[in-house]
Design a protein with these regions (language model features):
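Short acidic/histidine-centered micro-motifs embedded in hydrophobic/aromatic stretches
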Residues: 69, 265-266
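ATP/Mg2+ or Mg2+-diphosphate-binding catalytic cores
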Residues: 274-333
Length: 333
C-alpha cells in the first residue's frame, strides 16, 4: 500500500495508524485517511464529496476533504484496490471538547446543505429498513430452527430471537405512531448525520470528521446512537454524562416532541442484537466467532437492564411525557 500511495499521490507514509475504523497516516501536520470504497456507488461518493466541501465552506476545519490523486481523480483504482484518501488538519482534541455542543453545531450547519441527497439519504426510511432487516433475520431464524443446530451460539440465537422480534415490532409501531400523531418542527429538518455516531467517531487524540461516516437523516439518529453506545460500554447509564450531553446539545438545538419520540423509537430498535448475530454468521474464523458469542452473552445478560433503561428514559432525561403528549410503553417492566 505504501508504494501504491506513493505512485498515485506522491506521498510516502512512514507508518500507518488507525483512524477510527479506517487506516491512515500523518505527514507533517496533515492527517490522511485511506477509505475502501469498493462497496460504495459513485453517486453516493459524489454526495459525500459535496457535503464535505459544503461543511468546509461553513468553517468546520475538522472536516476531512477528498484528496485528488496525481491524475486529478478522487477515486484511485488498482487491480486489487479501490479507495479514496481524505485529509484534514492533525489537530489534537481539546480537553474541554464537548460532544453535545459540537454535534449540535455540526447538525446546525448540515441542515443548511442546499443540494438534493438521494443515495446517502435515510430520512423517512427507518421503518422500511428495520422491516427488511427483521424479515431477513426471521427467515434465517426459521432456517436454523429446522436445521436443529447444536452449537451454543446458534441455540442462544434460536431461544432469544422471538423476544427481539417483539422488541423490533414495538420500535416500528412506536415510529409509525409518532409519524401519525406528531408533527415535525423546523428543528426536525434533515441534516448531515452519521451511520453510528459514538464517542470515537470524531477521533480520540485528534479531531476528524470523515465523510465516509455520513448519511443524511433526522438529527435524533446521532443522539440516540451516542446514548446507546454509552449504555453498551458498561451496560449502565451514566445519567450525569447523558444529562450533560443532551443539555449541551439543546443549548444550540432544542429538541421537539417529535425528535424525542424518534430518538426513543431508535433506542427501542435493538440494533446491537442484530449486529452481533449478523457478525457471527458473517465470519469464518473461530476466534472471531467466539468474540461474537461473548458479546451476545453480554447483551442477553443485561436485557432486563436495557428494559429498565428504556422504561426510565424519559424520566431520567427530565422530559414530562404528559406535557409533550408522549406515549409510554406499558409492557416494559
Amino acid at each position: 500500500m505504501i508504494q501504491t500511495i506513493y505512485e498515485h499521490y506522491g506521498l510516502r507514509p512512514n507508518e500507518f495508524m488507525p483512524v477510527g475504523k479506517f487506516e491512515g497516516f500523518q505527514y507533517r501536520d496533515i492527517l490522511y485517511t485511506i477509505i475502501n470504497v469498493k462497496q460504495m456507488e459513485q453517486d453516493e461518493l459524489n454526495e459525500l464529496y459535496q457535503m464535505s466541501q459544503f461543511l468546509m465552506g461553513q468553517g468546520d476545519r475538522h472536516v476531512a476533504t477528498f484528496m485528488p490523486n496525481l491524475n486529478g481523480e478522487m477515486i484511485t483504482e488498482t487491480e486489487t484496490e479501490k479507495f479514496i484518501i481524505c485529509r484534514c488538519l492533525a489537530e489534537e482534541k481539546n480537553p474541554n471538547f464537548s460532544p453535545g455542543h459540537e454535534l449540535a453545531v455540526f447538525h446546525q450547519k448540515g441542515r443548511l446543505f442546499p443540494y438534493e441527497v438521494e443515495k446517502a439519504n435515510r430520512l423517512g426510511q427507518w421503518k422500511s429498513m428495520w422491516e427488511k432487516r427483521l424479515d431477513q433475520m426471521e427467515q434465517f431464524w426459521y432456517g436454523r430452527l429446522r436445521a436443529l443446530p447444536n452449537q451454543e451460539m446458534e441455540k442462544r440465537f434460536l431461544e432469544t430471537f422471538p423476544y427481539y422480534l417483539g422488541l423490533t415490532e414495538n420500535a416500528i409501531q412506536y415510529l409509525v405512531d409518532t409519524e401519525i400523531d406528531d408533527l415535525p418542527r423546523s428543528v426536525d429538518a434533515a441534516t448531515i448525520c452519521h451511520h453510528r455516531f459514538g464517542q470515537k467517531t470524531w477521533g480520540e487524540d485528534y479531531v476528524y470528521k470523515l465523510p465516509a461516516d455520513w448519511v443524511f437523516d433526522h438529527p435524533s439518529r446521532d443522539i440516540a446512537e451516542y446514548i446507546r453506545e454509552q449504555y453498551l460500554l458498561t451496560y449502565a447509564v451514566d445519567e450525569g454524562h447523558m444529562h450533560q450531553f443532551l443539555s449541551e446539545y439543546e443549548k444550540v438545538n432544542p429538541l421537539s416532541s417529535f425528535s424525542w419520540r424518534l430518538l426513543y423509537a431508535r433506542l427501542l430498535f435493538p440494533v446491537h442484537y442484530f449486529e452481533v448475530i449478523e457478525g457471527y454468521y458473517s465470519v469464518q474464523d473461530e476466534k472471531q466467532k467466539q468474540k461474537y458469542y461473548e458479546k451476545l452473552e453480554g447483551v442477553l445478560a443485561h436485557s432486563s437492564h436495557y428494559e429498565a433503561f428504556l422504561k426510565r428514559f424519559y424520566q431520567s432525561v427530565g422530559i414530562s411525557t404528559s406535557r409533550y403528549h408522549i406515549p409510554e410503553l406499558t409492557w416494559i417492566h
